[in-house]
Amino acid sequence: MLTLTSYFGFLLAALTITSALFIGLNKIRLI
């Protein structure tokens, strides 16, 4: 259970970071 929780936590963190970087790049392109 612990490994599954940590796996989903890591996946969620990676997705959040990727989304943040993608949005940041889009904002830079718009400016």
Swiss-Prot record:
Q: How does it sit in the membrane?
A: Single-pass membrane protein
Q: Which domain of life is it from?
A: Eukaryota
Localized where?
A: Plastid, Chloroplast thylakoid membrane
Q: What is its main location?
A: plastid
Which key words are in the record? Chloroplast, Electron transport, Membrane, Photosynthesis, Plastid, Thylakoid, Transmembrane, Transmembrane helix, Transport
| BP GO terms, sorted | photosynthesis
Q: Which GO terms describe its molecular function?
A: electron transporter, transferring electrons within cytochrome b6/f complex of photosystem II activity
Q: Which GO terms describe its cellular component?
A: chloroplast thylakoid membrane; cytochrome b6f complex
* Spans through the membrane: 4-26
What InterPro entries would the database entry show? Answer: Cyt_b6/f_cplx_su6 (IPR007802)
Q: Which SUPFAM superfamilies does this entry report, sorted A to Z? A: PetL subunit of the cytochrome b6f complex
One of its Pfam families is: PetL
> What is the role of the protein in this entry?
Component of the cytochrome b6-f complex, which mediates electron transfer between photosystem II (PSII) and photosystem I (PSI), cyclic electron flow around PSI, and state transitions. PetL is important for photoautotrophic growth as well as for electron transfer efficiency and stability of the cytochrome b6-f complex.
Q: How does it assemble?
A: The 4 large subunits of the cytochrome b6-f complex are cytochrome b6, subunit IV (17 kDa polypeptide, PetD), cytochrome f and the Rieske protein, while the 4 small subunits are PetG, PetL, PetM and PetN. The complex functions as a dimer.
Q: Which family does it belong to?
A: Belongs to the PetL family.
Q: What is this protein called?
A: Cytochrome b6-f complex subunit 6
